[in-house]
UniProtKB/Swiss-Prot annotation:
Its EC number is 4.2.1.10. It comes from the Bacteria. One of its GO terms (biological process) is amino acid biosynthetic process. It catalyses: 3-dehydroquinate = 3-dehydroshikimate + H2O. The active site is at Y22 (proton acceptor), H100 (proton donor). The record marks R17 as: Transition state stabilizer. Homododecamer. The gene is aroQ. SUPFAM superfamilies: Type II 3-dehydroquinate dehydratase. The keyword Glycoprotein does not apply. GO terms for molecular function: 3-dehydroquinate dehydratase activity. This is 3-dehydroquinate dehydratase. Substrate binds at N74, H80, D87, L101, S102, R111. Signal peptide: none annotated.
Amino acid sequence: MKIMVINGPNLNLLGIREKEIYGAKDFNQVIDYIKEEGKELGLEVNCFQSNIEGEIINFIHNAYFEKYDGIIINPGAYTHYSIAIYDALKGVEIPTVEVHLSNIHKREEFRHKSVTAPACIGQISGFGEYGYIMAMNALKNKIK
């Protein structure tokens, strides 16, 4: 089973940015953790990151053309306003789980709404990097 993990804006700053919210592990440590756990689950996991909305949309399109079985996406701040990412996810019809390291519902009011989550089979929020592992398990069980 082939899974694409897409990380949006500022996630490359993990370990630097607001450690009390996002944790002390740097981006590469989190990616290594995701890949190791994916391998344990018998998944082929490829990870991508961009601060640019159009590149994120291209990753989603590529997931379709490269025949990925599932997508895990942390759209970062695009969560709250990117209709374009929502449309891309709806357009490819690949089972997708939205992940957030922090609990977006316990943060600033503007972070409470996700416009991208309705295009996903589920949302995992507030479990740190373990949320990606939860998402991989969810996809593995959903896709079978």
